[in-house]
C-alpha cells in the first residue's frame, strides 16, 4: 500500500492510499505530489463537521484564479468503489462525474451521501490535525512512500 505524508501548518497527516480500489486516482495524486504540485497550496474550503478541501492551484500565492476552480490542466475519471466516506476518508473532489483533477477532501465525520458519488482513494487516522485545519491553512509538502 502506498503512503503519503502531508505536512501542513497544523501538523502531519499520514495517508494510506487505496492502490487496489482507485489505482488511477492514486497514481494521479502520487504523480502530482512528486512534482511538488501540492506544496504551498491552501485548504480553500473548510466546513466544520464535514470536511477540509485542498489541491486547487489557484490558492498558490500570486495566482489570479478563483480558489476552488483550478486543477492540473486535465480531468480524470471517477473510480467509484465500495469504500465509505467516514472520518478520515481521503476522496477526490469534482464538479461533476469525471471532472476531478487535483482537488481532494478529507472528511471530519461520516458523509454517506457522498458514497458512490466521489472516489475514495485513501484514509488517515490523524484526525487531531485534520480537525485543527482552518480555511487558508497551507499544505507545506506531500511526500510519497511506496
Question: Residue locations for each model-derived region?
Answer:
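Cyclophilin-like peptidyl-prolyl cis-trans isomerases
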Residues: 1-146
Amino acid at each position: 500500500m502506498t503512503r503519503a505524508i502531508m505536512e501542513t501548518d497544523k501538523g502531519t497527516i499520514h495517508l494510506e492510499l487505496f492502490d487496489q480500489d482507485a489505482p488511477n486516482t492514486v497514481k494521479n495524486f502520487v504523480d502530482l505530489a512528486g512534482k511538488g504540485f501540492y506544496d504551498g497550496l491552501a485548504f480553500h474550503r473548510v466546513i466544520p463537521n464535514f470536511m477540509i478541501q485542498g489541491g486547487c492551484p489557484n490558492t498558490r500565492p500570486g495566482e489570479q484564479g478563483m480558489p476552488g476552480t483550478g486543477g492540473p490542466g486535465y480531468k480524470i475519471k471517477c473510480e467509484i468503489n465500495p469504500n465509505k466516506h467516514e472520518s478520515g476518508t481521503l476522496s477526490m473532489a469534482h464538479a461533476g462525474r469525471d471532472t476531478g483533477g487535483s482537488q481532494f477532501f478529507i472528511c471530519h465525520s461520516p458523509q454517506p451521501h457522498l458514497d458512490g458519488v466521489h472516489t475514495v482513494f485513501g484514509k488517515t487516522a490523524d484526525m487531531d490535525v485534520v480537525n485543527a485545519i482552518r480555511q487558508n491553512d497551507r499544505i507545506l509538502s506531500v511526500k510519497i512512500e511506496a
